[in-house]
Amino acid sequence: MFRFQSLDDDCTLEEEEGLVEEEDEIDQFNDDTFGAGAIDDDWQEEHTRLAELDERVRDVLPGAGDSDTSHGGSNAHSSVLPPPSSSSRLYPDIDERGGGDLAESLTRLILGSDPAIAGVGSTSSDRSHLPPMLSAHPPHPSALAGPSSLLRSYQQHQQFLHRGPAPLSQINSHSIWENSMGFSPVSVNSGLIGQKEDKTLLSIIKEVGLPNRPPSLSRDEGRDLSERVPPPRSSSPVIGSPPVRAVPIGTPPKQPMSQILNQQNNHPSAIHVRASVPMRFPPPFPERLSPNNLLSIAKSPLSHSPFPAGVNPVLSQIQRAQLLNSQVGQFQRGPAPPLLQGGVGGFRPFFGQSGPRIGPHGPPLGHAPIRHNTTHLHPQHRRMLSQRMQNRGDHVGGRGVGERKNRDPYSNLMTQREKEWVAKIQMMQLQSTDPYLDDYYYQNYYEKMEKRQERDRDNRKEHTTKLITPQVAKLEHTYRPVQFAGSLGKLTVSSVNNPRKMIDAVVTSRSDDEEKREKQVWNKRRQILYTVEKMYSLLLEVQDFEKKFLQTPEHQRDVLLEQHKTHTLQLYNSLREKEWDDRVSDEQCLMIMSVRKGKRLISRLLPFLPQPQAAAVVMGIARNLPALAKKDKQDQVLCWLVEPVSVVIQSMSSTSLTDLLQELQGSEGQLPLVLQNKFGVTLLYLILSEGERMQSSDPNCQLMDDNRWTELVFSVTRELLKVPSSALSSPLFTPPNLVSLFSRYVDRQRLELLQEKLQITALSR
């Protein structure tokens, strides 16, 4: 119905229809420059002004029959110019008031509501520059009564709109684009709507009447404005990014009317359209205009358009009639769009359509969100804004679509390629023979998730979802490098991949003596191991003799006894020296006892040998004890011989005991080595303890008269007194009769020293 154009009348209908669709969002450039929290309306003052206006209008309406009263009410009305508000009723309905009053209301709304514009001139001066129809003629009392006055006032209003612009000298003083704001003047074009269409429209209004006002719909009512607050920055935080262009405040956005036309065709009873006025971009603000003045402009009532949203260029007669009523209702109740609308390609005209309106049945299906140009922003800021707009679109548009309710706010943090990369890593971790070791936390998380799903299922019989991972059979491959006889080292992977001339192996020729000596060493070791194994087989036969003897009949036991003697003799002969019958070969003894298994063999063999042969073996051990102790530092197996050797010592005669002590002392310097070994010290104490037992038990013992024994005991006593306590090894046990033995051969002072040293060794044991 109402169509406005700027002074530049070159915006054609095709250009208007070709405008790009954009969302009803705030202008990002304006918010980045001034911030979104700068609007601070004084609602108490507005509330007071609205209350005064309501009281004065009520005083005017009851006296409609009196022309003076009506005229006074009109003047009172014109003296107070409140800002438009969606919550209060500024103007009466068109059924209750005249058409002239409607025009006056429009003029007051545009020129008088804003404090910034009202400060330019007084109300009386404003009215002096207005056309005579709006300033000099108050409504007649009869205009408030019938439909004829309604049509007459409407016709006067149309004539005012089609009359053409006033001189620039008259408009300039109160132009909303001039003075301190620095905008170019805006005029109303008179050639938009013809008189023929107006006459047809008036005839339809006479016949049909004005339709009821539809309830105003706005999608901005339930919106939380806190989510529209971007960071209050005027430029991008990234150094080197393009600067933000200074675009004038108040330049409305461009928006086509395709969605509004669809809603008009689908719902003709509730049409809410706005007059779309294409306009050239006004010049920028002068440098003297501060941000505070810009904020006052943004807070002014002029920031909300008083006209309905986008008018269809070609409307039917019924739609025009409905539009007349919807305009008045929009003035009183409908909230106006925001002043600044952001979009691609700059700012849009002030009276342009601010965005598609949501109809009573929700947004049109298939409408894709339009993204703003945020290439000048920081990447992190751009991501935050895109997520905010997406979440806001889901919140508003998802009321009618159920599939958008459960949108993940973190869905845009990773790209699809990154998600696939993480999924592949998880699948590689799951291909494991021991998942609890390789991916412990994921296995526990999955078990907890399954238990939670089972609890939420309320004991319903459903198949639990199991993670099916591909079973990849792991082929155990053991790399065996190729070896060549005489080559240096092993072949490497680089040698296989990059073949080269092999290094010439230098063949070192050894002498025959070295080869013979090496063969002898290997043969000797093989011979020792063979001898030990053969002796073990004989020892097992000897150990099983008692079982076989009890199970064998009496007439066969003699044969079994002969076999037992033969096996025992073979065991001793493997240790005996060839030239001597009662002497163990030192070399053979050392060879066998140099092996750990050989030492265990001797400890198991001693109880089965006859007493003379066992004594010979013990003497051979005592004779070669320093060498055996040196080889037994790691094995520590000689201590296993203490028990069988003590049994053999207790069965010896005094002469054999003296010979054993002499073999243990050996040559000069052997006794200190014996005292440093645990088995050697224990063996010495056993020999001395057995001699003391013989002397104390038998007064006629030959040891008292044997000078060798006495000299050996003196030698041992001197060595014990001389050796330091740290060098004396602790024995396995200390016989208690050693003190009485030493008391026979030393004085009391030395006896106390020996006793103290023996106690120390006993405590250290």
Curated annotation (Swiss-Prot):
Domain of life (superkingdom): Eukaryota
Record field: compositional bias (Basic and acidic residues): 45-59, 218-227
GO biological process, one term: P-body assembly
Gene Ontology CC: nuclear speck; P-body; PML body
Any Pfam family the entry gives: PAT1
Residues bearing the modification Phosphoserine: 235-236
Subcellular location: Cytoplasm, P-body; Nucleus; Nucleus, PML body; Nucleus speckle
Region (Disordered) residue spans: 1-98, 119-147, 210-244
Residue stretches of biased makeup (Acidic residues): 7-30
UniProt keyword terms in alphabetical order: Cytoplasm, Nucleus, Phosphoprotein, RNA-binding
GO molecular function terms attached to this record: RNA binding
Start-end of Low complexity biased regions: 235-244
InterPro entries attached to this UniProt entry: Pat1-like, PAT1_dom
Subunit organization: Interacts with ribonucleoprotein complex components.
Record's function text: RNA-binding protein involved in deadenylation-dependent decapping of mRNAs, leading to the degradation of mRNAs. Acts as a scaffold protein that connects deadenylation and decapping machinery. Required for cytoplasmic mRNA processing body (P-body) assembly.
Protein family per UniProt: Belongs to the PAT1 family.
Protein name: Protein PAT1 homolog 1
Organism, as annotated: Danio rerio (Zebrafish)
Gene: patl1
